[in-house]
């Protein structure tokens, strides 16, 4: 993983798609995006059955409309979430503020863990309703492959989203690279708590400017000895 602030280099560099697609969290987002399409696509296309004796369609999962609605809703929202965070992955290296990067990574941790939990609930819900479904409701076994696919990819999505949360936490642990970023640095000349320039101890040598060296009196300033009285000739 790249050095820098929260797993990305210094802001302002050129966009590198090759580096983007090689990042583990970006790969997992794409995989999660595909899985979400499989889940809600399978339910929308083949998750509702027609019975000649009934006017309305019913959900293939034990005739429970909540099961189909849950799978479609979670799949669509997860699909949109993947798109949002894929866009964030593209924009993330351009974020110059360390605090903004921190917020983005923390949101990634929370959202990824949230979706891992909801996919776990969805897998358990769909699997349970499929298990208790009555064969007489679907004597021709229509849509059974799609129903099983939705359950399977709900299960796989648990791990892809949990993996995103783990990778985001690792990026959070990296933190800010002090060599490239500093969020607490203040220019001493702009620091109001330091009104005066710091004292610099003068050097022992001569000071050609006369500003900081030690004072040296002239060599003959006080060395002249008093001379005796000399009479004046008149």
Swiss-Prot record:
Membrane topology, Cytoplasmic segments: 1-23, 93-104, 170-234
Domain of life: Eukaryota
Lumenal side, ranges: 45-71, 126-148
Stretches for region Disordered: 201-234
Alphabetized InterPro entries for the sequence: Marvel, Synaptogyrin
Keywords on record: Acetylation, Cytoplasmic vesicle, Membrane, Synapse, Transmembrane, Transmembrane helix
One Pfam family from the record: MARVEL
Membrane disposition: Multi-pass membrane protein
Membrane-spanning segments: 24-44, 72-92, 105-125, 149-169
Annotated Gene Ontology cellular component terms: melanosome; neuromuscular junction; Schaffer collateral - CA1 synapse; synaptic vesicle; synaptic vesicle membrane; terminal bouton
Modified residues (N-acetylmethionine): 1
Subcellular location as annotated: Cytoplasmic vesicle, Secretory vesicle, Synaptic vesicle membrane; Melanosome
Tissues of expression: Nervous system (at protein level).
Domain called MARVEL: residue spans: 20-173
GO biological process entries: cellular response to leukemia inhibitory factor; modulation of chemical synaptic transmission; protein targeting; regulated exocytosis; regulation of long-term neuronal synaptic plasticity; regulation of short-term neuronal synaptic plasticity; synaptic vesicle membrane organization
Alphabetical list of PROSITE patterns matching this protein: MARVEL
Function, as annotated: May play a role in regulated exocytosis. Modulates the localization of synaptophysin/SYP into synaptic-like microvesicles and may therefore play a role in synaptic-like microvesicle formation and/or maturation. Involved in the regulation of short-term and long-term synaptic plasticity.
Family, as annotated: Belongs to the synaptogyrin family.
Protein name (Swiss-Prot/TrEMBL): Synaptogyrin-1
The organism of origin for this protein: Rattus norvegicus
Underlying gene: Syngr1
């Amino acid at each position: 993983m790249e050095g820098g602030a929260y797993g990305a280099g210094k802001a302002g560099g050129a966009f590198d798609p090759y580096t983007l697609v090689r990042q583990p969290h970006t790969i997992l987002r794409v995989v999660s995006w595909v899985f979400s399409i499989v889940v809600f696509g399978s339910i929308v296309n083949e998750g509702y059955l027609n019975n000649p004796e009934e006017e309305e369609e019913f959900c293939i999962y034990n005739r429970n409309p909540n099961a189909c609605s849950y799978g479609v809703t979670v799949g669509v929202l997860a699909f949109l979430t993947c798109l949002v965070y894929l866009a964030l992955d593209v924009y993330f290296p351009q974020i110059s503020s360390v605090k903004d990067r921190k917020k983005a990574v923390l949101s990634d941790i929370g959202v990824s863990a949230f979706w891992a939990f909801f996919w776990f609930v969805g897998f358990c819900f769909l699997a349970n309703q499929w298990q208790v479904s009555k064969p007489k409701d679907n004597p021709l076994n229509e849509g059974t492959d799609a129903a099983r696919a939705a359950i399977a990819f709900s299960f796989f999505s648990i791990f892809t989203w949990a993996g995103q949360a783990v990778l985001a936490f690792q990026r959070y642990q990296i933190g800010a690279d002090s060599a490239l970023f500093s969020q607490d640095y203040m220019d001493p000349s702009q620091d109001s708590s330091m009104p005066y320039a710091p004292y610099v101890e003068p050097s022992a040598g001569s000071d050609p400017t006369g500003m900081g060296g030690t004072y040296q009196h002239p060599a003959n300033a006080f060395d002249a000895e008093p001379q005796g009285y000399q009479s004046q000739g008149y």
